[in-house]
Amino acid sequence: MNKKVLTLSAVMASMLFGAAAHAADTRIGVTIYKYDDNFMSVVRKAIEKDAKAAPDVQLLMNDSQNDQSKQNDQIDVLLAKGVKALAINLVDPAAAGTVIEKARGQNVPIVFFNKEPSRKALDSYDKAYYVGTDSKESGIIQGDLIAKHWAANPNWDLNKDGKIQFVLLKGEPGHPDAEARTTYVIKELNDKGIKTEQLQLDTAMWDTAQAKDKMDAWMSGPNANKIEVVIANNDAMAMGAVEALKAHNKTSVPVFGVDALPEALALVKSGAMAGTVLNDANNQAKATFDLAKNLADGKGAADGTNWKIENKIVRVPYVGVDKDNLAEFTNK
């Protein structure tokens, strides 16, 4: 009787191992540069939601905690676990070459997302792709929004000099999105014939608390009453600026962000923010998951999808959001 029990146990264990092995055939390793980034939190949850609709896929999720060395170690572990594809949100875009060499060693395809690797890095591996946005587009659209509202609100021009006196909260220095948004928002305004004067510019590293501190310092400085527009590279920093302005009883100063986070959309609705730019987290997540799953299954990256791949890159478009079209992006 004991032998029969042991034999049955062995068979069941074998079946369970087989099921686990089968599940491992569609394992996809994912790293997020840090879980507590507002925007990447939305992307992460959207990827997890997409994966739930594909029961044959098992995601192995990792929080890299803004540490590239930690992320490299996580990738080593994922490869050791036999993942069939990697979806990597780099901590440092300059580390793409190192990550690619790890993946190449196991012949594992890789989809980078949100933080764009260099062209050289992407071209170095035939199984490397990128999902993201055209960084300069977000700056251009933000500039268009500011120009639209500047024209509609002549009272914003506090000193009546026809020039926008602005402060700008910048994201991570060197990050492609931060650099492009900072450059192109002002370029677009100037291209439209609007003169600008920078009163302050500093990094707040995409972070609400840091942005609040920066804005608070500016509102306590000599230019406090000259600020006509606040420009932020993302909504998290815009929200920090809103908090600081409220504390200084300056809620009439318009604030513009990027991402169209739910919290920011609520601020646009209330008037605390003048506008934002939709950084389409759901479609970036879906494209990342679709490409990674196809590659894990040995298919072409875009097979059976509507994604357009150009030079190994999927670009998800941005959309400007203000009160005029807010309803399109809420209650979904």
UniProtKB/Swiss-Prot annotation:
One Gene Ontology cellular component annotation? outer membrane-bounded periplasmic space
- Output the GO biological process annotations, alphabetical, semicolon-separated: chemotaxis
Q: Which InterPro entries match?
A: Bact_Solute-Bind_Prot2, MglB-like_PBP1, Peripla_BP_I, SBP_2_dom
Location(s) in or outside the cell: Periplasm
Record flagged with keyword Signal: yes
Highest taxon of source: Bacteria
The residues the record assigns to binding beta-D-galactose are 37, 114, 175, 177, 181, 234, 259, 279
Positions binding beta-D-glucose in this chain are: 37, 114, 175, 177, 181, 234, 259, 279
Q: What is its main location?
A: periplasm
Give the positions of the site Interacts with membrane-bound trg signal transducer. Answer: 97
Similarity section: Belongs to the bacterial solute-binding protein 2 family.
Domain topic, free-text comment: The calcium-binding site is structurally similar to that of EF-hand proteins, but is in two parts, with the last calcium ligand provided by Glu-228.
As for what it does, the entry says: Part of the ABC transporter complex MglABC involved in galactose/methyl galactoside import. In addition, binds D-galactose and D-glucose and plays a role in the chemotaxis towards these two sugars by interacting with the Trg chemoreceptor.
Q: What is this protein called?
A: D-galactose/methyl-galactoside binding periplasmic protein MglB
Provide the species name: Citrobacter freundii
Q: Which gene encodes it?
A: mglB
